[in-house]
Amino acid sequence: MSNSNIDNDPAKIDSLLRKAKSKKIPVTYDDINKALPLNKNPSIRQLEEAILKFSDAGVDILESNEDDEIKLDIGIDEEFKLSTNVDNESEDEVEEENIGSTDDPVRLYLKDMGGVDLLTRENEVEIAKRIEEGRKTMTASLCRSPVAMRCFIVWYEDLVNEKMLLRDLIDLEANMLHDEVHENDEEHNSETEVEEHEDNHLSMSRVETQILHNIIDRMKKISFICEELLIEAKKCYEESFDPKVLQNSRKYNNNLELLIHEVSEIHFNSKRTEEILGKMYGINRDLINKETAFLKLAEKYGVTRQNFLDEYIGSVINAAWKEKMLKNKKVAWKELITKESDYIDQMINELSVIESNTGLLVNDFKKLVNTIQKSERQTLQAKKDMIEANLRLVISIAKKYANRGLQFLDLIQEGNIGLMKAVDKFEYRRGYKFSTYATWWIRQAITRAIADQARTIRIPVHMIETINKILRTSRQMLNELGYEPTATEIANRLSMPLDKVRKVMKIAKEPISLENPVGDDSDGGQLGDFIEDKNAVAPIDAAIQSNLREVTTRVLATLTPREERVLRMRFGIGMNTDHTLEEVGQQFKVTRERIRQIESKALRKLQHPIRSKKLNSFRNGGKRGDGNPSDLLEA
């Protein structure tokens, strides 16, 4: 039988077949069905062909997956068979489903994650060395750039003049937590961590104060070295314009090595590094645009792309180069230089400005940028490898914090952010396994996210610390006393004012949604249905008002139309507002006195017992002497 239909998606079928044969386990019809193309409804013929393929290979096919343990492992370690359901699904249900395709983002994430092998200690060290090598190359390259040197000088001046905060210059967190990670894989109390993690946050300003003078001294030294290097580089280029002279200068090289060492000792904020890279990449883009435009112009005159690159790349584009190209044997070059002389002169001037701004020849600057970009790619790839291999660790930690106010996927996301920070700050020479080191960072990121985002109404960090202290004491006293302690007992235990304890306990209450269902059945309604709306009109008041309108209309109907109209306008009955005698008189084209007379006559008629009896029940705000509202409805 032809397998042409299966060939539409052979990878999944073959992968399933290989795993079943290698592990000598049967597959189910569901496994085969899931391995068929997802974007098409598999036909009976396709399914039959797939079944035949497995039968020919000697793989048993079951009706259903009766044995939960017969699964095709996709590489997720037994230690990390994790829950993907916040509603406390069993861990066995969360293991990846038999290679089958799915459009569930969580399962796709777990599937991709499971396809990456775990790292050994040697693998971690190897990746860490790649990251370190990439950073060293980038640091050395940046320190060779006068653009970076000028930035270092400006940063030092801003720091001294208090125009820049220390936390905006360096990575305070890296300095603060430099010695806080210990080789300790024991279980942590996640609840206690959420309560106490903010102590580190509160000490950030203290750390900033402690290391400020040390950083200023180091930046002062860096600034001085940069000034020396810039002066020597400027002198060299003005005299000889030969980069080899500078490269062979012992003084310059000694200062450069010293600068690289000093800069490497400072954990600069990522924004500061991006600032330097942004400037250099911007200049490089400008250069590429100019060179591209020059290439297109040369091609119009018949200069081939390869010939252009041979003559342009590696050459110093100046007046001497222009004269040299005029003597070129190729006619196309001579024609280009002759007819586009002004354009080339302008380009030479622009390149000269760039060389002046960067402090390097164009070719040297391009090589430097290329080295930086290469080291950046190397570092990013190494970080990516380390992160992807440790995603299981994030999930294993995140599941311990489920039902703490954040969705499980949000916990994973925050944990991944902590994992990325751990990769940035991992120091393999300390001898820790990366998982031990990363666990602290992942927990820190998750607990901070819970404290900041879990509550609908955000509470300040210092208040969260007080709340957690009181709740912790309350639980301890509950275990000791056997009953819920009062606010007074908690205040005495903590030596805290009673008013403050009551205030904190009130703040600690979680908000409740008005849409929470009441009762077990769907007809129980929502919590908001049982809360009184102070602004709403009570049903009895609405009925009285409606009855008053009807009675008033009937009573006014016993008057003449003119009298009814005058009373309605004067007292605003059935209108938006009342009217003055002058306004009513203008409507009827009579004097104010005549309107007053009509009004008086109409009011006397209403005072007649036959009419007034119907309205007396509504006097005194709608309450009769006996206070029975039903009398008003019967009026």
UniProtKB/Swiss-Prot annotation:
Region (Sigma-70 factor domain-4): 555-608
Start and end residues of each stretch annotated as Disordered: 182-202, 610-635
GO cellular component terms, semicolon-separated: cytoplasm
Family according to the record: Belongs to the sigma-70 factor family. RpoD/SigA subfamily.
UniProt biased composition (Basic and acidic residues): 182-191
Region span, Sigma-70 factor domain-3: 465-542
Keyword DNA-binding: yes
Listed name of the protein: RNA polymerase sigma factor RpoD
GO terms for MF: DNA binding; sigma factor activity
Keywords, ordered alphabetically: Cytoplasm, DNA-binding, Sigma factor, Transcription, Transcription regulation
Organism encoding this protein: Rickettsia typhi (strain ATCC VR-144 / Wilmington)
Highest rank taxon of the organism: Bacteria
Main localization (coarse): cytoplasm
HAMAP family linked: Sigma70_RpoD_SigA (MF_00963)
